[in-house]
């Protein structure tokens, strides 16, 4: 049987991890796409 605390931690960390990866990937893509504009 899964402990409520462990289940809560997993349900809380998973969305944060997904959002964190998406934001970091978007920032990297935006930085690379905007690089030619600075030159």
From Swiss-Prot:
Cellular component GO terms held in the UniProt record: cytochrome b6f complex; plasma membrane-derived thylakoid membrane
TM regions (residue ranges): 5-25
Lineage top rank: taxon: Bacteria
Repeat among keywords: no
Keyword field: Electron transport, Membrane, Photosynthesis, Thylakoid, Transmembrane, Transmembrane helix, Transport
Family (UniProt): Belongs to the PetG family.
Mode of membrane association: Single-pass membrane protein
Role summary: Component of the cytochrome b6-f complex, which mediates electron transfer between photosystem II (PSII) and photosystem I (PSI), cyclic electron flow around PSI, and state transitions. PetG is required for either the stability or assembly of the cytochrome b6-f complex.
InterPro entries: Cyt_6/f_cplx_su5 (IPR003683), Cyt_6/f_cplx_su5_sf (IPR036099)
Protein name: Cytochrome b6-f complex subunit 5
Natural source organism: Prochlorococcus marinus (strain MIT 9211)
Single GO MF descriptor: electron transporter, transferring electrons within cytochrome b6/f complex of photosystem II activity
Subunit organization: The 4 large subunits of the cytochrome b6-f complex are cytochrome b6, subunit IV (17 kDa polypeptide, PetD), cytochrome f and the Rieske protein, while the 4 small subunits are PetG, PetL, PetM and PetN. The complex functions as a dimer.
Protein localization: Cellular thylakoid membrane
Record-level GO BP terms: cytochrome complex assembly; photosynthesis
């Amino acid at each position: 049987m899964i402990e409520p605390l462990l289940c809560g931690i997993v349900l809380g960390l998973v969305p944060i991890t997904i959002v964190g990866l998406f934001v970091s990937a978007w920032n990297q893509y935006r930085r690379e796409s905007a690089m030619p504009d600075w030159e």
